[in-house]
Amino acid sequence: MTPQATHAATAAPRPLAVLLALACLGPMALAQTTPIDPPDPVSILVGQLDLEKYKATIKGLTQFGDRRQGTARNRQALDWIEAKLKSYGCTNTERLQYQFTEPARRTPASPQAPRAGGPAGQGGSTLFGKRAATGVNTDAMAQPDERLRALNAEPTPEGTSLRENVYCTKVGTSHPEEMYIVGAHMDGIGWGEAANDDGSGTALVMELARIFSQPGVETERSIRFVLWNNEETGLNGASAYVSQRKDLQGIESPKGSGKYPEPKWLGMIQHDMMMFDHGMPVPQMDAAGKPLLDAKGQPVLAPPKEQRAEADVNIEYQATAKYAEGAAKLAWAFRAANDKYATHYPAAVGFHMTNTDSTPFMDWVPAISLRENERGQQIGAGWNPHWHQPTDLYSAYSDKDFLLGLNAAQTTLAGVAQLTGAKVKR
């Protein structure tokens, strides 16, 4: 990608009114003889995504460290997210509350070492090729930054206490009783900044809320932008939402008001770890070109340091879900949206969605997940060395990495805009 191309793709977007005017004025000279196609509202909305705004939102989230659930830094991050959503014009914010019980602390399991062969991965996947060890860092001293050690020092309290998700809703003009849910999880672990897992997904959802909340933007159907808590403890925030809200779908309240506190779910779209697709782990070499060995004499494996040229956005559904057929159609609709509107990276569709906040929804509504790699087959095989580690820092990622996240945002924005009948009024 040339510097000129990068600049063109990441330059600050123009206001909606200017874009609409330019779209309409361009063909005026031919207006008397040639029919004028109306401007494409989806293209206009996708054009409002901006790399620097996306990066700035991720950076803002990192001020709260790893945002571990149950801590003051997690609650402060929720407050910050809600304030941002309101500042965008998505002012009808709400909190969904639930109780979570933190078990007594136990000695963490050792990271899984890679094994030969092709064993089963999570979500029905199969593991192939070289694999690096994975695990969750629980050692404060593994974080060399004293400031981050202090910021992340408060542990989750044991016992049962209150947790919250936060969300806001773009209310549809024609069908407010129906909605698509667009989500990401805002909590993290590992003693880092949780910049990628899942600051990258949280920032994506917030950017979509910003754009859909702009004056003049209308959708026929509603869109709910949700930031889940307690993903890292077992998808508890998303599960609480499903448990509390699934039986309220499509109910008008009060009767005759035209208001639907929980519109009927048409689809759930999750975003988790959006930026790092450097490829399969490879043997690391010393200065003499010899393989590096660990303390057990095994080769040290790690993914390449640069984003690979063939990086893509992975769109997953779960083949065993009750709504698998609808989820597959939704996934392929998003793939088509990527083909038409994304700027740098393509998308691929897989059917092993697992271990993410769309999973509690998948037997209630078509549900898909967008991410940097397949969750079971690739992330679970050590393709991301920063996963749950103290190195999940804003500074660990390049613009090529951030751009992959932005392309996922382009994909979801375009797909949701098409499905909800988005319009941009002059």
Model-derived regions: residue spans:
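Bacterial N-terminal signal peptides that target proteins for export
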Residues: 2-18
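Bacterial N-terminal signal peptides
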Residues: 15-27
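N-terminal capping segment at the start of a domain
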Residues: 33-72, 88, 96, 101-108, ...
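Second-shell loop/turn segments in exported
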Residues: 40-49, 62-73, 152-157, 187-199, ...
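A non-catalytic alpha/beta surface segment that caps or lines the substrate-entry region
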Residues: 60-169
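Alpha-helical metal-binding/catalytic segments enriched in His/Glu/Asp
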Residues: 166-168, 182-236, 412
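Metal-dependent peptidase/peptidase-like ectodomains
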Residues: 228-357, 363-367, 374
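His/Asp/Glu-rich mid-to-C-terminal helical/loop segments that flank catalytic regions of hydrolases
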Residues: 376-426
